[in-house]
Swiss-Prot record:
Transmembrane segments: none annotated. Residues 228-237 have a biased composition (Basic and acidic residues). This is Inhibitory synaptic factor 2A. Keywords: Coiled coil, Phosphoprotein, Synapse. Residues 318-337, 449-461 have a biased composition (Polar residues). Residues 353-379 form a coiled coil. The modification Phosphoserine is found at S177. It comes from Homo sapiens (Human). GO terms for biological process: inhibitory postsynaptic potential. The keyword Cell membrane does not apply. GO terms for cellular component: postsynaptic density. InterPro entries: INSYN2.
Length: 479
């Protein structure tokens, strides 16, 4: 019996009639609705899912379609009973797990909303409280945020010296490398005497004098730069002007250190050399001195009237040299003896620092080699232990003196050692030319490497299996 109430139909017939009609309608609706279509799944399992979904949909539909409370009350038990009976009548084979208890992947869209106790939600209940983790985002999670805050809120005064230091370091590096190249590559004559013989430095010296009468604090940044440029522009220096990059560095350093300069400016009457003899009271002085001497170690002649600072050399022995002494102006264009001596000493000493560096490098490489050899031994030991364990599990006896030619592990580990050895050989190859430069006398006594030239190629040829078997034996000599 179907009663119509404002176009909405409510099922009030007996249970036997309800079931087939409702199910049919539901199934039609289910098939047509794209949202409810279940993705590919085990057929039997799909039936179970379908039943559950249908039961719930039926319940919802009846509730929606019923207007009054009384009708709702009437319809609810009907649909529940129908759904329950249908769910029970589907044959459950042993292979089908009970869906409500299973931990299967959740694929159908509706179950999650309706079954609040669906296993995924019930077991991992803590997932629901995930938003609680959000507040921690704003909290301080270690030193990264600290650093950020410091950068944002910290005073600019703190930031500037840091940046200045960095720039200073870079500049120093650039200058050092430049000096290094010049001292090694240029003959002494080019460095010292030739530039000094030209009459042109007279004007340069005067300009420098005018500059030096002012205290460095008054000396503008561009003038520092200009001076370096003057020096660079001298035709006799026989060197291409260095790239503009260095110039940028210099201005940066000059500007950053301007406050420091004004703080410690010497008296106006003093010439630059007086400030210079106090070996870098402030880094900007250092910078200016380097700027004047950018083009190699040119020995300052008396024409510069001691305006240019003493020579800078990489090695500590050289930096201990006393500042250049004043000679009477009568000496004219001859280079001062101290300058020449210092230049010679520089040339003598620079290779010494190279040797020290190389020795340190060699020491490091030796340490690396020995440590990696130890690592290899340990690894081989581990491999053997594993093999032994496996052998014992299978009831076999395991001796380390086994047939290495046929032992897979031994062959592979030999390959490991081979690759490491190849690496060492290549490194050695790179080092040999340097060693020859250092000891040209011993060149004849260089021991020829026992390895063939092929071994050095960066991509070793793939060895055949028999070959690697052969090598396997003697590669493991140290075990």
């Amino acid at each position: 019996m179907v009663s119509k109430d404002t176009g909405k139909c409510i099922l009030t017939t007996s249970e036997s009639e309800v079931e087939p009609a409702a199910c049919l309608a539901l199934e039609m609706k289910y098939a047509l609705d794209p949202n409810r279509q279940i993705k590919k799944r085990n057929k039997a399992l799909q039936v179970r899912f379908k039943d559950i979904c249908e039961a719930q949909n039926e319940q919802r539909d009846t509730q929606l379609s019923s207007g009054q409370l009384g009708e709702k009350r009437e319809a609810k038990p009907v649909s529940c009973r129908a759904a329950y009976r249908k769910y029970m009548t589907v044959p459950a084979r042993r292979s089908i797990p009970n869906v409500t208890k299973s931990t299967g992947v959740q694929t159908s869209p509706d179950l999650k909303k309706c079954y609040q106790t669906f296993p995924l939600d019930r077991k991992k209940g803590n997932l629901k409280s995930l938003p609680a983790a959000d507040p921690f985002k704003s909290q301080n999670n270690g030193f990264l945020t600290d650093a950020k805050e410091k950068n944002e809120a910290g005073p600019m005064e703190e930031a500037r010296p840091c940046g200045a230091g960095r720039v200073h370091k870079t500049t120093a590096l650039v200058f050092h490398s430049n000096q290094h190249m010049n001292t090694v590559d240029q003959p002494l004559g080019v460095n010292c005497t030739e530039p000094c013989k030209s009459p042109e430095p007279l004007s340069y010296g005067e300009a420098a004098l005018q500059n030096s009468t002012r205290p460095p604090s008054e000396e503008p940044d561009y003038q520092l730069l200009g001076r370096a440029k003057q020096d660079r522009g001298r035709p006799n220096s026989e060197e291409p002007a260095p790239p503009a990059l260095r110039r940028v560095f210099k201005t940066e350093v000059a500007t950053v250190y301007a406050p420091a300069l004004s703080a410690r400016a010497p008296e106006p009457g003093l010439s630059d050399s007086a400030a210079a003899s106090q070996w870098s009271l402030c880094p900007a002085d250092d910078e200016r001195r380097r700027a004047t001497h950018l083009n190699g170690l040119q020995a300052p002649s008396e024409t510069a009237l001691a305006c240019s600072p003493p020579m800078q050399c990489l090695s500590p022995e050289c930096s201990e040299q006393p500042s250049q002494t004043h000679t009477p102006p009568g000496l004219g264009n001859q280079p001062s003896p101290t300058a020449v001596a210092a230049g010679e000493e520089c040339q003598r000493i620079v290779p010494h620092t190279e040797v020290v560096d190389l020795k340190a490098q060699l020491q490091m490489m030796e340490n690396l080699i020995s440590s990696s050899q130890e690592t290899i031994k340990v690894l081989l030991g581990v491999i053997q232990e594993l093999e032994k364990g496996e052998a014992h599990r299978e009831g076999l006896s395991y001796r380390t003196g086994q047939d290495t030619a046929n032992c897979d592990t031994c062959r592979n580990s030999a390959c490991i050692i081979y690759s490491v050895e190849l690496d060492f050989k290549q490194q050695e190859d790179k080092l040999q030319p340097v060693l020859r430069k250092l000891h040209p006398i011993e060149e004849t006594q260089v021991i020829p490497s026992p390895y063939s030239q092929e071994t050095y190629s960066s991509t070793p040829k793939q060895k055949s299996k028999t070959e690697s078997k052969k090598h396997g034996r003697w590669k493991l000599w140290f075990l």
